[in-house]
């Protein structure tokens, strides 16, 4: 099992993004640091424009640019710093992935262009202005 740590500064960014998008979904890309056996810390994320009440579409061009900038800022140390996956909000719904979420993440992890050993999906919403979320891991063999 993977452990994903989300530092306070990243949590604050997430809360601000969720407050700004209101009842519309928002999301982006997660980048992080390998800090121990099966343990990763989110060290950077993108916040892309909000979507609709029930969906969010990630802009691929902005995502690739953010990942490249992240790699450059970490001296391309792919062993320690890398793309972790995606995050988005479910402001009006459960923080559990929809069937569309599962499908999208399985496509990502099995895409040879992505080249990931795993991808993580974090889903958040605000409950009484506090961050509530879930984490899901997807592997290239199709398992979660």
Task: Put a short name on every predicted segment.
Residues 1-83, 91-144:
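Conserved beta-strand-loop surface patch within small alpha/beta domains used
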């Amino acid at each position: 099992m993977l452990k994903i740590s989300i530092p306070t500064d990243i949590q604050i960014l997430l809360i601000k993004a969720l407050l700004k998008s209101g009842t519309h979904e928002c999301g982006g890309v997660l980048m992080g640091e390998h800090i121990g056996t099966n343990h990763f810390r989110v060290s950077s994320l993108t916040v892309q424009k909000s979507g609709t009440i029930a969906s969010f579409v990630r802009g691929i061009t902005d995502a690739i640019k953010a990942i490249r900038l992240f790699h450059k800022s970490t001296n391309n140390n792919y062993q320690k710093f890398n793309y972790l996956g995606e995050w988005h909000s479910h402001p009006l719904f459960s923080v559990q992935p929809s069937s569309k979420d599962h499908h999208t993440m399985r496509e990502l992890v099995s895409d040879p262009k992505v080249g990931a050993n795993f991808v993580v999906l974090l889903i958040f919403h605000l409950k009484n202005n506090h961050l509530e979320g879930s984490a899901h891991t997807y592997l290239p063999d199709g398992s979660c």
